[in-house]
Amino acid sequence: METHHKVFFKSSFNMSEIPSSSIELIITSPPYPMIEMWDTLFSSLNGKIKSALEQNEGRKAFNLMHKELNKVWKECERVLEPGGIICINIGNATRKIENTFQLYPNHVKVTEFFHTNGLISLPNILWRKPTNSPTKFLGSGMLPPNAYVTLEHEYILIFRKGIKKRKFKPKSEDRYNSAFFWEERNKWFSDIWMDIKGVAQYLDVKK
């Protein structure tokens, strides 16, 4: 099968080059709100985010970051065709702000947006993604109730646009030639990824 690829190196806030309802599949992974490495990026999009972080208003910053992400999700919803699929890799964040440690559930906010905009959830994937270096817990982190569950998973959220599935020609040759073997189907469609390792991520910020 011959494929053609076109790359747009630009912000996804405005995908004006792509017609509405023209994309069958979107696979993406955004910056994760409340992960410190992305604070500067989110703050550049909305000055209120920087202020909220400086004032230790974690919940406010979290909600404002997702308001920015929602602009991208709105564009994704626009270009996705009815029955099309969007897959989003996103992890939750844990963070201590002004002596309060808590979880920021990014996957909940993303799911909330797509449900509000008429997409439906399909079974998602839990990506068991241990950190690349062993973590040492010392001091109060070894004592109840200060010891907390280690966050070592991310989500692959899967949504369909609308309740109707895409329609195909009966006995479509291309479709049936793409059928999975039984062993492949069981492995590739597992709802837990255990053997796919993540890689360290760095920002190349020029000062």
Model feature map: region roles:
Residues 1-207:
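Core catalytic lobe of class I
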